[in-house]
Amino acid sequence: MARTKQTARKSTGGKAPRKQLASKAARKAAPATGGVKKPHRYRPGTVALREIRRYQKSTELLIRKLPFQRLVREIAQDFKTDLRFQSSAIGALQEAVEAYLVSLFEDTNLCAIHGKRVTIQPKDMQLARRLRGERS
């Protein structure tokens, strides 16, 4: 067929079909197995549940010892300067603090569930402490 000269025509207002980008075309043309394998991801919540089970099974302390010791010494200085602590006293304090926090978070979670939520919020912790009689 012979080539003919094109003449300019008035546009009818319709959109012209867009050309695909080179990268998109290359991606479609490339075989699925030849590309880079993306890393495996667990569904949201799976890892959180695994961590919950792991920490419920364990008995080790979760707060690091030295930062906790520094905090205890800093708080104790407000009451009396030059206080000394036995290491067993710091250990007993840490055990008690962690037991209290775990119990508080359990009650906080129950308050969130009571509010038909799965995410704990500050108001849940305030309610838990209020019900315990710790704070008016």
Curated annotation (Swiss-Prot):
GO cellular component terms, A-Z: heterochromatin; mating-type region heterochromatin; nucleolar peripheral inclusion body; nucleosome; nucleus; pericentric heterochromatin; subtelomeric heterochromatin
Record has Coiled coil as a keyword: no
InterPro entries listed in its UniProt record: Histone-fold (IPR009072), Histone_H2A/H2B/H3 (IPR007125), Histone_H3/CENP-A (IPR000164)
Region annotation (Disordered) ranges: 1-42
Modification sites for Phosphoserine: S11
N6-methyllysine PTM sites in chain numbering: K5, K10, K19, K24, K28, K37, K80
One Gene Ontology term from the biological process aspect of the record: DNA damage response
Residues recorded with modification N6,N6-dimethyllysine: K5, K15, K28, K37, K80
Principal location class: nucleus
Subunit record text: The nucleosome is a histone octamer containing two molecules each of H2A, H2B, H3 and H4 assembled in one H3-H4 heterotetramer and two H2A-H2B heterodimers. The octamer wraps approximately 147 bp of DNA.
Family: Belongs to the histone H3 family.
Protein name per its UniProtKB record: Histone H3.1/H3.2
Gene: hht1
